[in-house]
Structures are given as structure tokens and as C-alpha cells.
């Protein structure tokens, strides 16, 4: 009944083509049969709509249960080796060793490197759940995000929200959303340079000969690398704009 009522509203709003449905976050092998049953229960009703799920277990994609996986960045390697037609990445609370994330405790380069990684590995999108979650886990009670940044101890600080509630209900930026903006700006600049000069030129800026490779668990660990890399990209763009 819900889907039958929802679909006409999506059409009316003109967003049905950009709407995504999902069955369950991070299904495990123990949940294979129940996930399959849940998907089959709604598959006919969602025919023609895009479906995706957060996923770490390649078997769900390999057996056709998840056609568009959104992979945890610390489990993405099998998906890169046998790549789906569309591949998104994500991080949340479990991605705290080595890989990019946006926790308050982490240095800024670990947040900003995401844009460079997305370009190199040609990810189609990126997902994170927490923009302005100002509650304890399960929304049992509200919290003051200026005093509590971890959903009352449920998640690492920085995971539940990227902006603070400001005056007149306008969002106040955090340093982390500024770093995310820089990451996406890096990605846009790289894509633009690729249009002008080709992918090889961009990759030479990212991984100059003799330099450290950019991977998901191993990458240059300094903001200086990112600043210099972006300067190289900008210079290459400027050369072609004259």
C-alpha cells in the first residue's frame, strides 16, 4: 500500500528517475535468504526504479541480489577487481583504520583525500547517512550538538552530523563539511582537466613518477600533498585556458 501511494507522488514531483530504494544496510551471509525474500517481495512493485544497498560482501552482488552496490571503503577491493557497471562507496562508523572518514579526531587530509580516491577509482557516487542527526541512537532523546558530538556515546564524534544548528534554523558549517567541500572541489577540477587534456595528465598530477600511490588504505598522509596536487591540476587547467 505504501509503495502504491508513494510512486505517483514521486512522478508528480518529477524525481522518480533519481529516486533510489534499498532493502537493508550491509546484509551478511547469515541473512542471505531473508534478504533475498525481502527483495523478491517488492521487486515487482519497484520495477523501473533504481535500487542500491550498502554492501561489504561481494557474494550479494555476484549472485545478482544487489545490482548497484554501495561499498564500504575498507571492503571495496573485490568490487574494484570485478567491477559492477555502477559502483558507489561509503563510510560510516566501522571505517576507522587507515581509510578516509570524517571523524572529528582525524586529521583533515583523511577527509579531503576522498575526492582524489573517487577520481582515481572512478566511483559513480558516495554515500553517508549523517548530515544533521541531533539525537541519541534510535532517536530516543534529542542532544545538544554543541555539547555532544557522538549521539550520546553511540557513534564516533563527527559521524552523526556535518553541520550545526544555527540562528534562524540555518545550518552552521563544520570544519569537516569544509573539508568535504574541498574533496569534491578537487574531484570536479580533476574531471574538468580530464575533459581538457585526458586522464593521463590528471593521473600524473595525482601520482607523479616516483611518488606515493593513492589507494583506499594507503595514500600520502599530509595536507601538503593535497594542496600541491591541486595546484598542479589548476596549473594544467590554466595552461589550456589561454
State where each predicted segment sits:
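Catalytic domains of carbohydrate-active enzymes that cleave complex glycans
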Residues: 1-32, 40-56, 139-242
